[in-house]
Every structure is written in structure tokens, then in C-alpha cells.
Amino acid sequence: MISMLFPRSPLCTAAIVFYTCVCIPLGRLKKNGGDADAHDDDGYNLVGVMFGDKEKEEEICCPICLVEFEAEDAVTHLPRCAHLFHINCIEPWLLRGHLTCPLCRSFVLAPTPPTQNVNNAHSSSTLYLSIFFFFCIFLHLLGYL
């Protein structure tokens, strides 16, 4: 928007650099809850269970490897669609970056509800504004503004 109003303004350049270098990384950090290790597990928390007699009545097989489930197999249900897979079959699928169930293509992860209260939203916007003003003063001192 600023670039449309002031196409050759240093303020436009400062706003774009600020948004790219500060707002986007801070937004990602806030989205991850401030956890630096959030990318390590990609948010997949599968609960493994042992395949038992209750499931055996259905005589079903793993949709990935097409091998029938047997007693004591390590299996898991995907959280949203509840499809059953061998853990050793579904983990490589998810770790390769697939975000959907290989059977029905529904998203694996349920959207997380926002847990941020109004005070946190206000303080983060205040942080963004103060960083922006500091950045503008810095550019002014360097002679760009």
C-alpha cells in the first residue's frame, strides 16, 4: 500500500525492509509459541498403540504397505480422520512434508485455536511499532530518510 502511494520514497523502502526482516520472523515466532524447537517435530504428535483383538475383527490392512494388521503391531490413528496406519508407514509420509492423510487427503493437523488474550495482542503490536520507529530513526541517522 505504501509503495503505491510513495513509489520512490525511502519510507516505502524502510517499511518493506521492516516488514520482511522484523514482522514476518516475529510473526512466525509468535505462531510457534516462541518455541525454537517447533520445527523439529513439525507439530506431528502421533499416539502409537498396539493393534489388538478389538480391531482384528474387521480384518483391515494398512493402506500404505497393504499388509494386514496383526496383534502387537504398532499402529496409530490420524487425529482428524481416524484412519489407521502402521507407525513405521505413516511417519515417513509425514516427515517428507505431506500435510494430508494418504487415504482421504484430509489435513492431518487440526487448526489450533488462538490462545492469545487481548493484552498480549496489544503488547505485541506495541513492540512492532517501537521496533519500526527505532528502525526509521536509524535510517534517518544514516541519511536514508
From Swiss-Prot:
PROSITE patterns: ZF_RING_2. One of its GO terms (molecular function) is transferase activity. The keyword Mitochondrion does not apply. Its EC number is 2.3.2.27. GO terms for cellular component: membrane. The chain crosses the membrane at residues 125-145. GO terms for biological process: protein ubiquitination. Residues 1-29 form the signal peptide. Pathway: Protein modification; protein ubiquitination. InterPro entries: Znf_RING, Znf_RING/FYVE/PHD. Its main location: membrane. It catalyses: S-ubiquitinyl-[E2 ubiquitin-conjugating enzyme]-L-cysteine + [acceptor protein]-L-lysine = [E2 ubiquitin-conjugating enzyme]-L-cysteine + N(6)-ubiquitinyl-[acceptor protein]-L-lysine. The keyword Glycosyltransferase does not apply. A zinc finger (RING-type) spans 62-105. Keywords: Membrane, Metal-binding, Signal, Transferase, Transmembrane, Transmembrane helix, Ubl conjugation pathway, Zinc, Zinc-finger. Gene3D superfamilies: Zinc/RING finger domain, C3HC4 (zinc finger). It comes from the Eukaryota. It is a single-pass membrane protein. Belongs to the RING-type zinc finger family. ATL subfamily. The RING-type zinc finger domain mediates binding to an E2 ubiquitin-conjugating enzyme. This is RING-H2 finger protein ATL18.
